[in-house]
Amino acid sequence: MIHPETNLDVADNSGARQVQCIKVLGGSKRKTASVGDVIVVSVKEAIPRGKVKKGDVHQAVIVRTSYPVRRADGSAIRFDRNAAVLINKQQEPIGTRIFGPVVRELRARKFMKIISLAPEVL
């Protein structure tokens, strides 16, 4: 579960290393986000000469959470750290590579570009 002010790792090569959630999109009273949800983030740490820089505000889709994600078959999957992929206004990833595994739930949310770039889909 991702709340506003939660810090997340960035799982792509957009140039950002750490981001902080500013807002959970999808309703005026929505407080938490899970895997596959879109959030608004601020870049807190970035590498030199990256596509994004510190202080930039972007949208991001959550690809890994430490809070367990329940599946229809009763199983659950969770990760050690929270991670997100930065996306543009057209819901396409800013980076050209994805690092680490992503969850299968992204396919139902129509993030096919992220699924195809990921090295592993769990």
Swiss-Prot record:
It holds the Pfam family Ribosomal_L14. GO terms for molecular function: large ribosomal subunit rRNA binding; structural constituent of ribosome. InterPro entries: Ribosomal_uL14, Ribosomal_uL14_bac-type, Ribosomal_uL14_CS, Ribosomal_uL14_sf. The keyword DNA-binding does not apply. GO terms for biological process: translation. GO terms for cellular component: cytosolic large ribosomal subunit. Keywords: Ribonucleoprotein, Ribosomal protein, RNA-binding, rRNA-binding. Binds to 23S rRNA. Forms part of two intersubunit bridges in the 70S ribosome. Part of the 50S ribosomal subunit. Forms a cluster with proteins L3 and L19. In the 70S ribosome, L14 and L19 interact and together make contacts with the 16S rRNA in bridges B5 and B8. Belongs to the universal ribosomal protein uL14 family. HAMAP family: Ribosomal_uL14. This is Large ribosomal subunit protein uL14.
